[in-house]
A protein has these predicted regions:
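Cytoplasmic loop-to-transmembrane helix junctions
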Residues: 17, 54-55, 89, 154-163
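Cytoplasmic membrane-interface "Motif A"-like loop-to-helix N-cap segments
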Residues: 79-95, 154-158
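Short amphipathic helix-loop junctions that connect adjacent transmembrane helices
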Residues: 38-58
């Protein structure tokens, strides 16, 4: 009888099914961030021939914006669009940003006049990076709120849903 009651409420292993979707989404976003963080410098310095200082500047800007944008994304969600729409919009921006990262253009070449880079590819790269940053800004602060809303007020399982 307990298993039919659990299934009727849309639970899986004692928690709402939506928790696992939120968990998978958060896992994907964190994998994206840490993977990008470690590969970005190599990509910029080896493929586009940025100096170490310039590559670290882009990496530092990316990392700081990823941590700063959730303040703005949470504010916009709270005041204007709501948390579910913010999570969806953030996820779509993240997908678009990662799809844009698939376009790499031509590798930079060292010439006697300096470094010759594919400026169109770099423009797409920066746009894609911006889409990822804004996507994280909408997704990150609001997905935790969605997890909290999956449980009724006072539900003993609520704390376990965040761990």
């Amino acid at each position: 009888m307990t298993s039919t009651t659990t299934a009727a409420h849309g639970n899986l292993w004692g928690h709402p099914k939506g928790l696992y979707i939120c968990f998978g989404t958060e896992l994907w976003e964190r994998f994206s961030f840490y993977g990008m963080k470690y590969l970005l410098l190599l990509y910029l310095t080896k493929y586009h021939l940025f100096s170490d200082a310039a590559g670290l500047g882009v990496l530092g800007s990316y990392a700081s914006l990823v941590y700063a944008m959730p303040v703005l994304g949470g504010l916009i969600a709270d005041r204007f669009i709501g948390m579910r729409k913010a999570v969806t919009f953030g996820g779509l921006l993240l997908v678009a940003g990662h799809l844009g990262m698939a376009f790499e253009g031509e590798a930079a070449r060292q010439t006697s006049d300096g470094v010759l880079r594919d400026e169109q590819a770099l423009s797409i790269f920066y746009l894609s990076l911006a889409l990822i940053v804004v996507g994280v800004g909408f997704l990150k602060p609001n997905i935790s709120t969605v997890v909290g809303k999956l449980y009724p007020e006072g539900d003993a399982r609520r704390d376990a849903g965040f761990t």
